[in-house]
Amino acid sequence: LHSDHFQNFQNMMEGKTYGRRMMMKFVMDTSWFHPITTKEIESVKIHNGTTFIPEEKMKDASGNFLTNAHLYRLYIYHWLMGHEHISQQPRLIVRWLEQKEAGMPLEIYAFIIDSSLAPYEWQRSQIVEHIIESMGWFGLRLYQCPSAYDVTNSNVYLSNKPVTYRKEDM
């Protein structure tokens, strides 16, 4: 008797499924969320060759630009929809998860058509690299806990002088 469980990949390897599932989370630094600027829209055009949605649809009902996070999620969804190695069946999901103290996770749930290990990992890496690269076009950053390097190289200087919060009389 075998007491360990195992995963049967035979159907996937024989092409009887939609591909191999890819589910990833990218934790975004919410301090970088803001209404998208025209500079960021131009950056997307330069790097992508076009905007993925017309500029008039980048505004809400009152005429204000949508946030860069909202448009980034739409961009990633449309980019994956057009990706030749992503299956359009059974589902493609790009969504925000509940915000945590470390940031707001963007979850990607998709199926990569190439189910063999090496091609799957190659395509998955290409997708991750594009997702990370394109964040900068929208003025976004991944969240990262401060490291010792960040603390020692910050521009905040500590002083042993007492701080006075009183306003000086003029």
Where do the protein language model's features map onto the residues?
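Long, non-transmembrane cytosolic or organellar matrix-exposed soluble domains/tails
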Residues: 46, 52-170
